[in-house]
Structures are given as structure tokens and as C-alpha cells.
Design a protein with these regions (language model features):
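N-terminal phosphate-binding caps/lids of nucleotide- and nucleic-acid-binding domains
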Residues: 1-188
Length: 188
């Protein structure tokens, strides 16, 4: 997935971070917690599901001004949910879950799926997934292939209140609106 370690290290300074991990073949996993950039204890053996779970709690607990802006801005949380939804679709082999503190139900929940369409179904719903057409394009020369693309587009029957485009190029998220504005500003 290309998760950058320094970003995770930075999170340990502004949130309570707990990492639980187990690899295939191990009898038990290990859990470690961080606070204020410091490991609270040595990794402890624990029961775990195969893979790595990163739990971030009490975000900005030690930065009162930033925490207050989060508490007063549902917009920040909706941006987090939107971003996690996009990554859940692109990285269909990884499970994602995000919920507000105290909420009974997750706002984003995807299981490591067998296909991208399964991830779309779990994140955006059955009606969206049912109205998608798979597209695959390549330069048709496997020996020297320099271009290939796959994805989904909605069919002409689908009507939505809001347009959602999820675009990753070479595994990197591409923020379409931001880049279109930059391109347009170069010419106009």
C-alpha cells in the first residue's frame, strides 16, 4: 500500500496509537501502544487476526486548539470518510473501518475483498455496484507494455446526487479537481 512510516510515527505524537499484527503461521500476534511519540511498553503477545491493525484514538488529545476545530467541524470528519472510502476501493485487499467515537455503526467498512467491485459494493452500496461497467485498456503488447488501465464507469441508467471519481495512477491517489484547476490556470 505504500504507507509511509514517518506519517505513522508523526501520528504517535498527536494521538493514542495501538498497532496489532500477526503474520501467517504465527501462533499469536503482538500489540504495542504509543503515546507522545513513545512506546508505552514492549510488544505484548495477544490474539490477533492475520494482518496488521492500526488503531488511532483521541486524535489531537494534546493539541487543544486543533481538537476544538475538529469537534466543531463535521466537514473534517466527512473528508476523512471520503478519503478512506477511496483508499478502500483502490486497495481491495485491505480491510478498512472508520467510525466516530461512540457511534454504533461504522461510516466506512470494507473487508479485504476478492475484487474491486466487491469493495465498491461494500463502500458505496449495491445500487452503485449494480450500475457499473468494467473497462480494461492496454497497448496490447505484453512484451513491451507501457500502458494499461482498468476500472469502472457508471452506465447511463445510474443517477446520483453527487459525482464521485476515484482515480489512482501508478498506485498514487490523484486528486482530480485540484489538478484540473492547476491545468486550467496554466491556460486561462
Amino acid at each position: 500500500m505504500g504507507f509511509r512510516g514517518e506519517a505513522l510515527a508523526s501520528m504517535t505524537y498527536v494521538a493514542h496509537v495501538t498497532i496489532t499484527t500477526i503474520t501467517q503461521g504465527q501462533l499469536h500476534g503482538y500489540r504495542v501502544s504509543y503515546r507522545d511519540g513513545v512506546m508505552e511498553h514492549q510488544p505484548k503477545a495477544c490474539a490477533a487476526v492475520k494482518g496488521t491493525q492500526i488503531m488511532i484514538e483521541n486524535l489531537f488529545y494534546n493539541m487543544i486548539a486543533r481538537r476544538k476545530t475538529l469537534q466543531n467541524s463535521p466537514d473534517d470528519y466527512s473528508k476523512i470518510v471520503d478519503l478512506l472510502s477511496r483508499f478502500a476501493v483502490h486497495h481491495s485487499n485491505v480491510s478498512f473501518s472508520c467510525r466516530k467515537h461512540g457511534a454504533a455503526r461504522a461510516d466506512v467498512h470494507s473487508m479485504a475483498a476478492s475484487s474491486r467491485l466487491d469493495s465498491i459494493r461494500s463502500v458505496y452500496g449495491v445500487s452503485v455496484a449494480r450500475n457499473l461497467i468494467k473497462i480494461e485498456v492496454s497497448d496490447n503488447d505484453p512484451s513491451s507494455s507501457i500502458f494499461s488501465m482498468d476500472g469502472f464507469i457508471s452506465n447511463s441508467n445510474y443517477v446520483a446526487k453527487k459525482t464521485t471519481m476515484v482515480l489512482f495512477i501508478n498506485g498514487k491517489w490523484f486528486q482530480i479537481i485540484f489538478h484540473i484547476i492547476i491545468l486550467l490556470s496554466m491556460f486561462f
